[in-house]
């Protein structure tokens, strides 16, 4: 039985968010041993339990107070909200953070030989989807009448199988659509992974753990989008060089020993550094340019 005094976090057991959710928790310093077939895993160094479940179970577990936190795609969360509201429920949760992974879009797709003249092309069509409420919300706002065909998997095969005229499904690269003779015509919802918390009062111990976890997650996300940069540069080009490298804070600038015309620059840049940027630095007279990844970061 679960120890109710420990913080409970639900993550996807398998699927597109599973690996990155696990990596995020590990990068936050939570030592966990996730065995493939086990529902529960226990952190070795913090009072945290990890529950590994189907992604569409996570919103309900959070809203019903079974777990304290959940990492879930916004698309799954929004569909669960709309489903519960359609049943007369008033679901509650707290959105804590949007995360930096799990990007996808919920899109309409038609057979390649079908013309697209805007949403009106869907009038009276039968549309296969795993997200009936998100689809209905979108098309109702446009005054489009349609028939829904609910499928929980392999939505992209519905037109070829004669089950539907069009589909509404998650798209990452579009390769699966193309392989099934479909083309993406309209994005109706964009989604990322997010961290949600159950509503209601928590113990001071749990709330303290959540606050610590939020700070660590923010640090991990910020570090992923930042680089530590070291270089030597002409003193007279200092301002131009700094403008090429948007930083989290003002850079550290030190004189080079034995050379009063050149300086050493150390800074954290919050933009991904491309080869073009490094070449521009070189053109301004910079040398010994080092770009290093940052594992953790806290301001």
From Swiss-Prot:
InterPro entries linked to this entry: ATP-PRT_HisG_long, ATP_PRibTrfase_cat, ATP_PRibTrfase_CS, ATP_PRibTrfase_HisG, HisG_C, N-reg_PII-like_a/b, N-reg_PII/ATP_PRibTrfase_C
A GO MF label: ATP binding
Enzyme nomenclature, EC number: 2.4.2.17
GO biological process, one term: L-histidine biosynthetic process
Keyword terms: Amino-acid biosynthesis, ATP-binding, Cytoplasm, Glycosyltransferase, Histidine biosynthesis, Magnesium, Metal-binding, Nucleotide-binding, Transferase
Catalytic activity: 1-(5-phospho-beta-D-ribosyl)-ATP + diphosphate = 5-phospho-alpha-D-ribose 1-diphosphate + ATP
EC category name: transferase
CDD domains noted in UniProt: PBP2_HisGL2 (cd13592)
This protein's pathway: Amino-acid biosynthesis; L-histidine biosynthesis; L-histidine from 5-phospho-alpha-D-ribose 1-diphosphate: step 1/9
Subcellular location: Cytoplasm
Key word Metal-binding present: yes
Cofactor section: Mg(2+)
GO cellular component: cytoplasm
Top-rank lineage group of the source organism: Bacteria
Regulation: Feedback inhibited by histidine.
Entries under PANTHER family matching the protein: ATP PHOSPHORIBOSYLTRANSFERASE (PTHR21403:SF8), ATP PHOSPHORIBOSYLTRANSFERASE ATP-PRTASE (PTHR21403)
Subunit structure: Equilibrium between an active dimeric form, an inactive hexameric form and higher aggregates. Interconversion between the various forms is largely reversible and is influenced by the natural substrates and inhibitors of the enzyme.
Family: Belongs to the ATP phosphoribosyltransferase family. Long subfamily.
Function statement: Catalyzes the condensation of ATP and 5-phosphoribose 1-diphosphate to form N'-(5'-phosphoribosyl)-ATP (PR-ATP). Has a crucial role in the pathway because the rate of histidine biosynthesis seems to be controlled primarily by regulation of HisG enzymatic activity.
Protein name, as recorded: ATP phosphoribosyltransferase
Organism of derivation: Blochmanniella pennsylvanica (strain BPEN)
């Amino acid at each position: 039985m679960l120890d109710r005094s420990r913080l409970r976090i639900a993550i996807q057991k398998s699927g597109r968010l599973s690996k990155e959710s696990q990596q995020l928790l590990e990068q936050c310093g939570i030592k966990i041993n996730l065995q493939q077939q086990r529902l529960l895993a226990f952190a070795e160094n913090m009072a945290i339990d990890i529950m590994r479940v189907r992604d569409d179970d996570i919103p309900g577990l959070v809203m019903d107070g079974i777990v304290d936190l959940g990492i879930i795609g916004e698309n799954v969360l929004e569909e669960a909200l709309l489903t519960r509201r359609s049943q007369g429920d008033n679901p509650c949760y707290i959105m804590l953070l949007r995360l930096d992974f799990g990007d996808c879009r919920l899109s309409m797709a038609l057979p390649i030989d079908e013309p697209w003249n805007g949403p009106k092309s869907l009038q009276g069509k039968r549309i296969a989807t795993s997200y009936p409420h998100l689809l209905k919300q979108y098309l109702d706002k446009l005054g489009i009448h349609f028939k829904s065909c609910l499928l929980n998997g392999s939505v992209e095969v519905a037109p070829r199988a004669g089950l539907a005229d069009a589909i509404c499904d998650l798209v990452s690269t579009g390769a699966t659509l193309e392989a099934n003779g479909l083309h993406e015509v309209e994005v109706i919802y964009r989604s990322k992974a997010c961290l949600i918390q159950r509503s209601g009062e928590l113990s001071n111990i749990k709330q303290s753990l959540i606050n610590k976890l939020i700070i660590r997650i923010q640090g991990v996300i910020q570090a992923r989008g930042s680089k530590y940069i070291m270089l030597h540069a002409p003193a007279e080009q200092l301002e131009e060089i700094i403008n090429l490298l948007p930083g989290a804070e003002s850079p550290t600038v030190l004189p080079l020993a034995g050379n009063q015309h050149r300086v050493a620059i150390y800074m954290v840049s919050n933009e991904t550094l491309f080869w073009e940027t490094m070449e521009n630095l070189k053109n301004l007279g910079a040398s010994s340019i080092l770009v290093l990844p940052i594992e953790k970061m806290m301001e």
